[in-house]
Regions:
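Extracellular, disulfide-bonded carbohydrate-recognition/adhesion ectodomains
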Residues: 1-109
Length: 109
């Protein structure tokens, strides 16, 4: 089986950022989400995570007040950063996310 990528080491963060750069995308979904408790959780248990949040993130809600329950990495001028996000940003903000969003799947051994 597989799941959205879990970033649990500096080496994996570097590799994910490299893959994201090579993809030509601006946004890439990762395996981090907001659980029912309101806390952020990874799709895989027992993770020692590496975080690289954008300034002001996680913000929990978008500018219109919608809950941001999922996390993607976003390309900025100086690199890739975590950003919490609504579930389907391309539908709500196609000018920013349309055709620019992908994901990285990690296959379990």
């Amino acid at each position: 089986g597989g799941h959205l990528v879990v970033i649990d080491s500096a080496e994996k963060w570097t590799r994910v950022a490299q893959l994201a750069d090579e993809s030509g995308l601006t946004y890439v979904w990762i395996g981090l989400y907001r659980a029912d408790s309101g806390e952020l959780a990874w799709v895989k248990d027992n993770v020692d995570p590496v975080y690289n949040w954008a300034a002001g993130e996680p913000s929990v809600r978008d500018t219109n007040g919608a809950a941001e329950n999922y996390v993607l990495i976003a390309r900025r001028s100086d690199g890739w950063y975590y950003n919490d996000c609504i579930g389907d940003p391309a539908a709500k903000y196609p000018q920013f996310y349309g055709g620019k969003t992908g994901y990285i799947i990690e296959i379990d051994p």
